[in-house]
């Protein structure tokens, strides 16, 4: 069988595989994670789950803009409770806290605790100034 036959749609369907065609490649929404987190110091040695969490935080910034969630001097913040992080990443409480702490240590996040059982205000920080 010629190599080109492997990529034919009929063959794909016989093997319970299906390819994306033309406009179908844009059917889904995606989280964006900055490439510099994988290529530049001091980020490239960070836990991959912390990098993913940073991408989730950046995604939630869109909701902050729509909701008008800005604090002093117009700084954008997000509400992203530990229970939601645990659910989204499929991890335990301690792991979620560890990932947030790792982002803080890398200079990618600042947390402002509110107390009284309220979720912390999370400020995702720009990464450009942290690249060595």
Label each residue range with its predicted role.
Residues 1-83:
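Short recognition helix of helix-turn-helix/winged-helix DNA-binding domains
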Residues 3-5, 22, 60-124:
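Winged helix-turn-helix DNA-binding recognition segment
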Residues 56, 125-127:
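Generic beta-structure capping elements
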Residues 128-132:
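Short, amphipathic alpha-helical interaction segments positioned at domain boundaries
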């Amino acid at each position: 069988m010629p190599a080109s036959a492997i990529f034919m749609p009929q063959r794909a369907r016989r093997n319970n595989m299906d390819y994306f065609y033309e406009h179908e490649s844009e059917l889904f929404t995606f989280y964006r994670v900055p490439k510099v987190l994988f290529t530049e110091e001091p980020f490239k040695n960070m836990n991959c789950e912390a990098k993913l969490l940073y991408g989730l935080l950046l995604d939630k910034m869109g909701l902050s803009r729509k909701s008008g969630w800005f604090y002093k001097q117009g700084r954008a913040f997000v509400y992203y409770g530990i229970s939601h992080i645990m659910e989204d990443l499929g991890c335990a409480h301690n792991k979620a806290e560890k990932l947030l702490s790792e982002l803080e240590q890398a200079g990618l996040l600042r947390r402002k605790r509110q107390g009284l059982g309220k979720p912390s205000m999370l400020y995702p920080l720009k990464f450009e100034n942290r690249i060595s």
